[in-house]
Amino acid sequence: MTTMEQRRNQNAVQQQDDEETQHGPFPVEQLQAAGIASVDVKKLRDAGLCTVEGVAYTPRKDLLQIKGISDAKVDKIVEAASKLVPLGFTSASQLHAQRQEIIQITSGSRELDKVLEGGIETGSITELYGEFRSGKTQLCHTLCVTCQLPMDQGGGEGKAMYIDAEGTFRPQRLLQIADRFGLNGADVLENVAYARAYNTDHQSRLLLEAASMMIETRFALLIVDSATALYRTDFSGRGELSARQMHLAKFLRSLQKLADEFGVAVVITNQVVAQVDGSALFAGPQFKPIGGNIMAHATTTRLALRKGRAEERICKVISSPCLPEAEARFQISTEGVTDCKD
């Protein structure tokens, strides 16, 4: 092989590596090539901004709150980030092409997947709400396993991250579900990053740690079970309602940023409260999800779960930008979420 051919092959390999590098989030360290000092880049990372996308999506006033980052430095950082991350208009055809790359993670039930048009969508927030024993946590356990499957089997070929606010996560359930899909149980457990959240501030701080982990390895799924449980205990009474909703809105915005930056499927469970009015005397109490309009607007897809006969559960699509309102029946067994056996 001639020297010219060797150089041509090296250039081709380099170009391929560059294309692979540019696919996905940019590490925040790439801002150094745009003239940002390494000490300032470290301050950004310490503040939880691990990607250039994360910097570009962050409001200017939040960047100013980072210790040691002056007004002039913020302008320079924002300018450098905007050159690497396109934030302007794009055509609908380009957006349509990008949407074709979105992955759906199977729920474990073919009937439920049919209603969801493939499964749980990556790059967005899916909310599961319902009363206790409606199947929310069991669906989350199943997704922790199915997200590790190959894409041609309905998986996401990535790891799962589980933030547990209620103490209901059980690793042995993952082992049972892994057997069903023919996966090695030890590998499945190793690929699930688990954290217990103890208060709302801790729950928010865990998202900063999540971002630093996602930049290092591929995660396909982030679960918060439940997103609202700690808000019901940390904030009490109408006097703290405004503070609770502001804190919740910021937490949900951080979840959406992770979905945008890393393309993970974000699944949150939500508790419900009985809505007692005059009609409840005749039709029984109606349940509504916690969080009000802030939760409703922050989630992309909203699914309501309720109990059926025995182990049967019903999932209803409440709101979605692309899914019609529909219902699906599924069953909870030792193997996780499965189709009903009529």
From Swiss-Prot:
Keyword DNA damage appears in the UniProt entry: yes
Keyword Metal-binding attached: no
Name of the featured protein: DNA repair protein RAD51 homolog 1
Key words of the record: ATP-binding, DNA damage, DNA recombination, DNA repair, DNA-binding, Nucleotide-binding, Nucleus
Ranges for domain FtsK: 100-314
Induction remarks: By genotoxic stress and by DNA damage (gamma-radiation, UV-B). Regulated by ATM in response to DNA double strand breaks (DSBs).
Pfam family, one: HHH_5
Organism: Arabidopsis thaliana
